[in-house]
Amino acid sequence: MKKILALLIALFLFIPCAPAEETAPVYELPVDFSGGYVPDPAAFTKDSYEDASLSVRMEKRDIDGVRYDIAWIKVSSPTQLRTAIAGEPNQVVAERPGRMARKVNAVVAINGDFYTQRKDGLIWRQGMPFRNLLNPEKDILIIDNQGDLHAILGNETQTAELTALLQSGRTIVNAFTFGPAIVKDGKALPMPETYQTRFDSAIRAPRTVIAQMGPLEYVFVEAEGRVQHSKGVTTDQMGAFMESLGVETAYCLDGGNSSIMLFNGKYYDANYTDSEREQSDIIYIATAVPNE
């Protein structure tokens, strides 16, 4: 019996141990105004960026006299969809979007809702509430802690919808008040009457849109306008285009002279050449991989 036991022990000692499973790296960023990591220069091409936490593909489409600048985005963590502001929270200051984007190491960026131009609205940035004054005439957009976009239409049920969202366990990371929401549940929405009569939504102009395709998958779009090669779009036209891309939710941000898209710190559109309008905020995508 002792010989058998000794043999079993000897066999056990000579059996190679299975290697311990390696833990997959977790890529995420703090929910604050600190910005992302410096992107890897070698991960850029003329129209793309890819690393372990992020994939961005840039595209231009010319359709019926309108140029659409498109950023197709996939991230590993909801914390990579971020906002940056000019100055400190609640300061009424403005800064060039390109400068803001470079300061936070944005891979791709678009303008936000220029919240300092108004005194109402639901305005949150990076988990911090700036303003909680709902305007039932305006649609709002919420980006929650899971990175999902929620378009809440401007009507009498707005407060109830917002309450239901928060009671579901989701929390607000970023909230915007501009609009209109142009796609919801995969379908283009008709232009609300208030936007048509008061907010120039029926005029062909440059437009900026943020949209969601699926979990942690987004599309930024700018329709160029007021330039020779592109005459701009109405919000109804923008909604039809976004629906054709297959997005689930799409929301208009500030447009006109505010519309801008940047990739790798440079203009991706032709609306800007030597100047850009100073604004209060941007929306951007950052890598969560430390570039040592």
Residue ranges and their predicted role:
Residues 2-20:
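Sec-dependent N-terminal signal peptides of Gram-positive bacterial secreted proteins and lipoproteins
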Residues 17, 21-140, 148-152:
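Zymogen propeptides
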Residues 68-72, 181, 209, 282:
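Conserved hydrophobic/aromatic beta-strand scaffold that supports enzyme active sites
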Residues 76-78, 115, 148, 156, ...:
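Short, glycine-/Ser/Thr-/acidic-enriched flexible segments
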Residues 85-92, 155-160, 223-227:
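Short, solvent-exposed aromatic-acidic interface loops
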Residues 91-94, 160-166, 201-202, 229-235:
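A short, polar/proline- and glycine-enriched secondary-structure boundary/capping micro-motif
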Residues 113-200:
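Active-site-adjacent helix-turn-beta-strand microarchitecture at beta-sheet edges
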Residues 119-136, 142-143, 193-248, 252-253, ...:
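Conserved, well-ordered active-site substructure
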